[in-house]
Amino acid sequence: MGELYLVGGGLSDVRDLTLRALEVLASVELVLVDTYTSVYDVSEGDLKRLLNGFGGDPEVRMCSRRDLEERFFDLCEGYDRVALLSPGDPMAATTHVALVVEAADRGWDVEIINGVSVFTAAPSKSGLEMYRFGRTATIPLNVRSVYPYDVLESNRQAGLHTLFLLEVAEDGEFVSVADAARYLLEIEREEGRGVLDPSDLAIAVVRLGFEDELVAWGTLEELSDWEPGEPPQALILPASRLREAEREYIRRVLPHIRDVRGV
C-alpha cells in the first residue's frame, strides 16, 4: 500500500511537536488530525504554515471520531504517504492501536513517532514517584460506573498512586476536577468500602502543557467544590502513604488550591 505514520502531537499545541515529528509531517502527502481523543489547539491553516516552513506542503484534514473509526482508510485512498497527528502519544488511545493493526493487515508500512503524554507528564508535574503509579482509569461523562473506584481500591491496596483521566466530549462538554471528586466521594458513600475519605489528599492537573497550566493540591472535599476552568483536566489520588521526598515536593512546590485563581 504505502507508508502510514502515527505522530504524537504532545500536550497542547504544535509547539510540543518534536523535530522528528515535524520532519515526518512535512514529508507526507496527507496529514489527518485527530480532534477528539483530547484537547489540542491546532488549526488547519496554522499547521500548513508551520509545515511549509519545513519544506512540506501536505493536504491537512481535521478528523472527527467517526472519521477515524469508520472512514480512516477511505480518507487515505489515493495517497502513498499519510500521517495521523494526534494529541499526546499516538498509541495511548485504544482506537489508534486497532487502527495500526488494521493498517498492517492492509499492507501499510507503519511507523510510530512518539510524543509527550499525560501518562508521563502528569506524574512528573505532581512530584510523585513515577514507578509508584498503578493502573490509570478514566472518569466518564454522564455514565455511572464503579470501575474507577475499583481501580483506586486495587492501587491503594498495592501502595500505588492513581491517575484519573477526565473525559472530554467532541461537543466540548467535559468532566472537571470537581465533578471527578464528587463522583468518587459519592461512590464511596454508596459502596462503603473505606477506599477513600473526604480528607484525602488529591492533586488537580489542569490544562497540562497550555499557557494557563495549573497543578495544585487540596483535599477531595475541597476539590469537590472547586472549578479551575477549561479542559483538559486530570486528577491524581496519591497512595495512602507518601515517601518523604513526595510529601516535601507537594508541601514546598505545589500550591494549595486556596492560593490559586478561582478560589
UniProtKB/Swiss-Prot annotation:
InterPro entries: 4pyrrol_Mease, 4pyrrol_Methylase_sf, 4pyrrole_Mease_sub1, 4pyrrole_Mease_sub2, Dphthn_synthase. GO terms for biological process: methylation; protein histidyl modification to diphthamide. Keywords: Methyltransferase, S-adenosyl-L-methionine, Transferase. Gene3D superfamilies: Cobalt-precorrin-4 Transmethylase, Domain 1, Methyltransferase, Cobalt-precorrin-4 Transmethylase, Domain 2. S-adenosyl-L-methionine binds at L11, D89, A92, S117, V118, L166, L208. SUPFAM superfamilies: Tetrapyrrole methylase. Pfam families: TP_methylase (PF00590). Signal peptide: none annotated. Pathway: Protein modification; peptidyl-diphthamide biosynthesis. It comes from the Archaea. It catalyses: 2-[(3S)-amino-3-carboxypropyl]-L-histidyl-[translation elongation factor 2] + 3 S-adenosyl-L-methionine = diphthine-[translation elongation factor 2] + 3 S-adenosyl-L-homocysteine + 3 H(+). Its EC number is 2.1.1.98. GO terms for molecular function: diphthine synthase activity. S-adenosyl-L-methionine-dependent methyltransferase that catalyzes the trimethylation of the amino group of the modified target histidine residue in translation elongation factor 2 (EF-2), to form an intermediate called diphthine. The three successive methylation reactions represent the second step of diphthamide biosynthesis. Homodimer. Belongs to the diphthine synthase family. This is Diphthine synthase. It comes from Methanopyrus kandleri (strain AV19 / DSM 6324 / JCM 9639 / NBRC 100938). The gene is dphB.
